[in-house]
Amino acid sequence: SDVCSSDLLAMVGAARGYRVIIVMPESMSLERKVLTRAYGAEVILTPATEGMAGSVAKAEALGKEIPGSVLVRQFDNPAGPKIHRETTAEEIWKDTDGKVAALVAGSGTGGTITGTGQRLKELNPDVKVYAVQPAASPLLTGGQAAGHPIAGIGPNFIPSILDTSVYDDVISIENSDAFTWSRRLGAEEGILAGISSGAAVKAAVEVAHKPEFAGKIVVVIIPSF
């Protein structure tokens, strides 16, 4: 599971009485594990060296072992992009009065950037979309996947729901910058956000400084709290 989905699934399970099993890499943050368990979900950790692919494989195996189980398959679930097309993109369009010039979003499952980017480009083909990836694992730009600490983005595979044609460019962010900008969000803006949010904001600042976006609206998605 990625950084946010584990909490959401655990919350639904608690509210509806479902047994919820969350599989995540052992490298996920302590607070993520504690919070997910606090909602009553079971947490199974997979080796950090296997990345998110290892967690996906473990979840698939559990799905075959446990009768009546349902696999969310967030990296392959079309509901992800669909809900962002219907909600996130429409909210951005409405709140900017249709003046959004660029969208910056991290690429984890691919749901956010795919759904939001597709819909914004339908509304205005001139909107530019930027995907954010860890510099340490530049898979989106043809590089080698590798371990990194920016939980929530940069799985060590290309998710099936990620529309790689929707983004105009990919911005690679160093681990140290992601941490720094996450802290700056808290200290300077009062927004306590996660590391992937720090990476996204750092990328958005780079985009905003491009001459072509002077005086224009650049929207960044801050997904992790």
Predicted segments with their positions:
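A glycine-rich helix N-cap at a beta->alpha junction
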Residues: Y18-K58, L62
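Conserved beta-loop-alpha segment that forms the PLP phosphate-binding cup at the N-terminus of a helix
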Residues: S6-R16, S197-A204
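Anion (oxyanion) recognition and catalysis
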Residues: A14, R37, K64, K121, ...
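A short glycine/serine-rich beta->alpha loop
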Residues: A101, G186-L192
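Glycine-rich phosphate/pyrophosphate-binding loop at beta-loop-alpha junctions
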Residues: A10-M11, R16, T49-V56, P78-S172, ...
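Short glycine/threonine-rich catalytic loop with a Thr-x-Gly-x-Asp
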Residues: V72, I191-G198
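Residue-level detector of anion-binding/catalytic polar loops
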Residues: R19, E42, K128, I191-L192
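Short, small-residue-biased leader/transition segments that mark boundaries at the very start
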Residues: S1-S5
